[in-house]
A protein has these predicted regions:
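Long, largely alpha-helical accessory region at the distal end of helicase-like NTP-driven motors
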Residues: 308, 406-534, 743-774
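Conserved RecA-like P-loop NTPase helicase motor core
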Residues: 333-422, 667-668, 704-705
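Conserved coupling segment at the C-terminus of the helicase ATP-binding
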Residues: 1-5, 95-98, 103-298, 305-313, ...
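Catalytic core segments in nucleotide and nucleic-acid processing enzymes
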Residues: 307-310, 326-334, 338, 364, ...
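Conserved Walker A/P-loop ATP-binding site and its immediately adjacent core
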Residues: 6-55, 76-79, 237-244, 303-310
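Inter-Walker segment of RecA-like/P-loop motor cores
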Residues: 40-92, 325, 329-334
């Protein structure tokens, strides 16, 4: 593995290395780019400038005779019908002697797509697959299954239990085979590789697609890659290289000892500003207006995670290319010295080089997201107890490297959103960035520490210092990077067991696979990750001892509530509030948030940012609602999430009073429908069965509307938290956070006064609700 700072010339390194292997007689030589189109074009131009012979067809005689390097993208190498497999039907396998995987971390998303199955809702087999697992899915969550079938909430997802997959693998295979043989089907390219391991795949279902994904990519199917004499991985200086082991099958001992530059400080100059960390009161729209003003003088690139995020820039964007061809054309203009202005790119955190004046201002607006159901579930499962998803940190690191492509380059990086701002100050996430990026983040914080709650205009004046090449800033920026030592490669302690267990299972060695994962569980300290690993253990154990696998899964569920629900019924404790609300609130303000006024404000903003009506983020809404209840000093639960039945959220307000909450934050209808109203009635019944007659549960529906359709009936006395009520509540919580940030939050009498001042006492909450009307 070769680690070079972003912009450090990995492409040239890779081409020269392969040419040297050809000179040694270790051909044929293959260069793999993470994507096609623009990235391939860049590489071919680079090879031409170096005088290195390249072709784009691995069946080309020049490649086969080791006279030229073949350049292909990740999709060409890794797929079920790859020309590099010994199972190739139309011709002999294309051999590989030496291979370079460029920007290996960036190639992973393509690798996952081409070695897993995605069945869109338009497919002929979409409904039959759901029908096949109907009863198994109901056991996980009948409500989520109904949401998926009706397509009401795009964020609804379900995972098929592994024991059901084992039991019905042959029937599933028969269902999929006819579709997989159709050229043009989404199953056509990956099927030959995935069908070999279908019985141990995970299956995640949403209203848009069914994702069928092996525990690790089955790269053994790509025979020539597995048999290559030399495999070189080119990566940026990211802090976690575990995925090279789990996904590419790289040797952990090689990954742990990468070839690196003499210093990690050979990166370009970056001032990295998170305005909302400096002043949490600054809004995203205020920052966007200031960025738009900068773009009149400097080429500016904004990277957003999704199309809805892109729409926030519609009023400011000069260009918003979406296709590869459009992106190539815009980037070419920017590189030619033309002032293009403000360019918005969607989900392009890697693969685009923007040196010098092509990009002087780079903006990341929002945390990189997970869009497929499987990606979302894996993010929930593998986020640490701190909430950190290592893959997001890697994508941020890749993204902020787009604007500096040499150690002489410079760029201002602006981060928008409370989550991004929090990542830059939380020690648990800061350490997951590369040494150079950590140093630049710390320097930028040092420069802005004295600014306090300055308005956005003054914050942006700091950016102008770097852009105008202020001599004091330039000198300080260079000194901060001097002498930074490169890090060794980091491989998590569970990476090798995950890969080795999968490889053993592919060969039928389920006893070995289960033992490897059992040992990995015992070695892990993070409770959430331990639960995820324990579920992986149960998947392999189920193949040889289904009963014991259920016992293992039952423990996993106590450690990580996003794991599967076991066959036997789960229980959930009843909750009650015994302590004074102010006492509990004061205690949790201390334990749930980092110290410092900015950290408190950012913690609240991160939570409030999720408390919005959004069809794509209902899981995040419910998690934030749980957190809000706890922060305000109540007891709070998510019964439906924990045991598969009951309300979405349950708040205990004290003195026997409860809110029984059905959260329909993904609803877009103008009235409350029959099924949503029925769910609220079922949730109320669940509460009455489990709580004493002395307890009162108020049925609360979170919905844009408080009016029922004619065929719908709500429980007697039911209330709605509408958009207006939710906004009033979150506005008051935000004002409360401003006050809390500047007082002694350990003093319950102070917190009690602030709760009362902001109408957040238990007795005040009813004022945010509206009656549900017929």
């Amino acid at each position: 593995m070769i680690k070079v700072n972003t912009g450090g010339g990995k492409t040239i390194d890779g081409l020269v290395i392969l040419q040297s292997y050809l000179n040694e007689g270790l051909g044929p030589a293959l260069y793999v780019t993470p994507g096609g189109g623009y990235m391939e074009t860049q590489l071919l131009d680079e090879a031409h400038n170096l005088g290195i012979a390249v072709v784009t067809d691995p069946d080309d005689a020049k490649y086969l005779r080791s006279e030229a390097i073949a350049v292909v993208n990740t999709h060409k190498l890794f797929n079920g019908r790859t020309v590099f497999s010994e199972k190739r039907v139309s011709a002999p396998m294309a051999p590989i002697g030496s291979v370079v995987i460029d920007d290996a971390h960036a190639a992973l998303s393509t690798l996952h797509q081409t070695l897993s199955l995605s069945i869109p809702s338009s497919s002929n087999v979409f409904i039959p697959v759901i029908d096949l697992f109907e009863e198994d899915l109901k056991q996980q969550s009948a409500d989520s299954l109904a949401d998926i079938r009706e397509g009401n909430y795009e964020s609804a997802l379900l995972s098929v239990p592994f024991w059901a997959i084992r039991h019905k693998a042959d029937r599933l295979r028969e269902l999929l085979r006819s579709e997989a043989t159709k050229y043009g089907s989404s199953l056509y390219w990956p099927w030959p590789a995935v069908q070999e391991v279908l019985a141990i795949c995970r299956i995640v279902i949403t209203s848009r697609e069914i994702a069928i994904t092996p525990p690790c990519p089955p790269i053994g199917h790509v025979t020539a890659f597995s048999q290559a004499k030399r495999r070189i991985y080119l990566t940026a200086t990211l802090s976690d290289d575990s995925v090279l082991v789990t996904d590419f099958g790289a040797l952990p001992e090689s990954v742990a000892k990468p070839i690196t530059p003499l210093t990690a400080g050979d990166i370009g100059e970056r001032m990295i500003l998170a305005p909302q960390e400096i002043n949490p009161a600054v809004s995203g729209d205020e920052i966007r207006k200031e960025v738009a003003a900068l773009s009149r003088s400097y080429n500016t690139v904004v990277v957003v995670p999704s199309a809805p995020s892109r729409s926030r820039w519609a009023a400011y964007a000069d260009e918003a290319p979406t296709t590869n061809e459009q992106i190539v054309a815009v980037v070419k203009r920017m590189k030619s010295g033309v002032h293009v202005g403000l360019v918005v790119l969607t989900n392009r955190y890697d693969g685009i080089d923007l040196p010098q004046d092509a990009c002087r201002v780079l903006v990341l607006d929002g945390l990189p997201g997970s869009f497929s159901g499987d990606e979302r579930l894996q993010s929930l499962l593998t986020s640490r107890e701190s909430g950190v998803d290592d893959r997001q940190v890697q994508r941020i690191e890749q993204g902020i490297g787009r604007g500096v492509r040499s150690n002489e380059d410079h760029c201002v990086v602006i981060l928008i959103g409370p989550r991004l701002a929090k990542l830059t100050i939380d020690p648990r996430t800061l350490k997951r960035f590369s040494p150079a990026t950590q140093a630049q983040l710390e320097l930028s914080r040092t420069v802005t520490t004295s600014m306090g709650a300055k308005p956005i205009g003054e914050i942006m004046d700091t950016a102008k210092q770097a852009l105008s090449r202020d001599s004091d800033w330039v000198r300080l920026a260079k000194s901060k990077l001097h002498g930074i030592a490169p890090q060794p490669g980091f491989v998590s302690q569970f990476a090798a067991p995950l890969r080795h267990a999968f490889d053993a299972a592919v060969m039928g060695g389920f006893v070995t696979a289960a033992k490897l994962l059992a040992d990995a569980v015992e070695a892990e300290d993070d409770v959430k990750l331990k639960g995820w690993l324990r579920q992986q253990h149960a998947i392999y154990l189920d193949q040889i001892d289904p009963s014991q696998a259920q016992d293992v899964l039952r423990v996993a569920r106590t450690e990580n509530t996003h794991t599967l629900r076991p066959l036997s019924a789960l229980t959930i404790r009843t909750i009650a509030t015994s302590d004074d609300q102010a006492d509990t609130c004061a205690r949790r303000l201390t334990t749930m948030f980092a110290s410092g006024s900015s950290a408190i404000r950012l913690g609240f903003e991160e939570m409030l940012d999720d408390l919005k009506f959004d069809p794509a983020r209902t899981e995040e809404f419910e998690a934030a609602l749980l957190q809000l209840g706890l922060v305000l000093g109540f007891e709070s639960q998510r019964p439906e999430n924990e045991i598969g039945e009951g309300p979405d959220n349950l708040w205990s307000l004290g003195e026997g009073q409860y809110w029984v909450i059905e959260a329909k934050s993904g609803a877009t209808s103008t009235k409350i429908g029959k099924r949503d109203a029925a769910q609220l009635a079922v949730a109320e019944l669940w509460f009455k069965k489990r709580y004493a007659d002395t307890c009162t549960g108020l049925p609360v529906m979170i919905h844009p509307a408080n009016t029922l359709y004619k065929d719908a009936t709500a429980p007697v006395g039911a209330k709605a938290l509408t958009e207006a009520g939710l906004k009033q509540l979150t506005d008051n919580v935000r004002a409360f956070s401003v006050s809390v940030a500047v007082v002694d939050r350990t003093r319950s009498e102070v917190i009690g006064r602030l709760l009362a001042d902001h109408k957040l006492n238990a007795n005040d909450l009813a004022s945010y609700l509206a009656p549900i009307r017929g």
